[in-house]
């Protein structure tokens, strides 16, 4: 077991070096996935398992405190981008077995209050992503190592070179989404039956995605603030780089990253 953990630590060092412009090669891309899988596989057994990675990260496969958003917030619209191929990678992301959204019970309860308030104003919530398994984050890391794969650059990061995505924080080894109380969403206008114009698209890497970006219309800015105010009024905190991203301030698992897949069955087993 010690050999596997040591290999995992070594691979992370290689990944970090490559992403900082110190040299990337195909061998790094190919070895990163199996090494990371050692840690993730331990936390994906039939019975809930908790493990600690070499970097100190607590991993867990226990889904017992999670719920499906389709049940907790039934009027929410789901467009799970990482289940589709329309995302910055261009492929379905590892760990997304079904187009469902999952959150901790606490986050889902708070989101239901947000939804109820916005319904009175003529809006529904549209969810792009919620709980994200650690396996998916590893998928992002491996994709970032392959600097030749720029299929989706014109749609999601036209202003940036791919090799800066990790140093600038767009891609990271761990994501708050994996703790289960973070989600990405927008507003859906029930009158027009269209998404509200936010002056930018989900997962666009650049300043355009900052909530307070100045070069959008007054209406687009106001729409961003409607979403932001509704979320913060019910205990969610925003991210200053992404208008769509919110985390429950009192999240129940601030130090645990979960590994179970995104699927109905994963939650029903919890």
Residue ranges and their predicted role:
Residues 3-25:
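Sec-dependent N-terminal signal peptides of Gram-positive bacterial secreted proteins and lipoproteins
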Residues 22-130, 135-241, 250-270:
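Extracytoplasmic cell-surface/polysaccharide-interacting catalytic and binding patches
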Residues 246:
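Conserved metal-phosphate-binding beta-hairpin within the catalytic cores
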């Amino acid at each position: 077991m010690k050999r596997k953990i040591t290999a995992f630590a070594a691979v992370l060092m290689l990944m970090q070096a490559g992403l900082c412009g110190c040299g990337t090669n195909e061998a790094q891309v190919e070895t990163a996935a199996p090494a990371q899988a050692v840690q993730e596989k331990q936390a994906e057994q039939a019975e809930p398992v908790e493990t600690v990675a070499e970097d100190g990260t607590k991993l867990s496969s226990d889904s017992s405190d999670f719920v499906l958003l389709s049940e907790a917030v039934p009027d929410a619209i789901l467009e799970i981008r990482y289940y589709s191929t329309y995302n910055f990678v261009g492929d379905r992301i590892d760990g997304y077995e079904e187009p469902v959204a999952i959150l901790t019970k606490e986050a889902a309860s708070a989101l239901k209050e947000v939804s109820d308030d916005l319904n009175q104003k003529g809006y529904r919530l549209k969810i792009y992503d919620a709980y994200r398994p650690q396996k998916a984050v590893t998928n992002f890391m491996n994709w970032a190592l392959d600097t030749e794969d720029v299929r989706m650059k014109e749609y999601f990061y036209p202003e940036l070179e791919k090799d800066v995505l990790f140093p600038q924080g767009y891609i990271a080894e761990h994501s708050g989404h994996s703790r289960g109380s973070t989600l990405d969403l927008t507003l859906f206008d029930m009158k027009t039956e269209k998404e509200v114009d936010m002056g930018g698209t989900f997962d666009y890497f650049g300043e355009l995605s900052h909530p307070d970006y100045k070069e959008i219309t007054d209406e687009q800015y106001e729409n961003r603030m409607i979403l932001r105010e509704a979320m913060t009024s019910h205990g969610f905190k925003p991210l200053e780089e992404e208008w769509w991203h919110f985390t429950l301030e009192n999240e129940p698992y601030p130090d645990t990253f979960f590994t179970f897949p995104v699927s109905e069955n994963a939650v029903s087993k919890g």
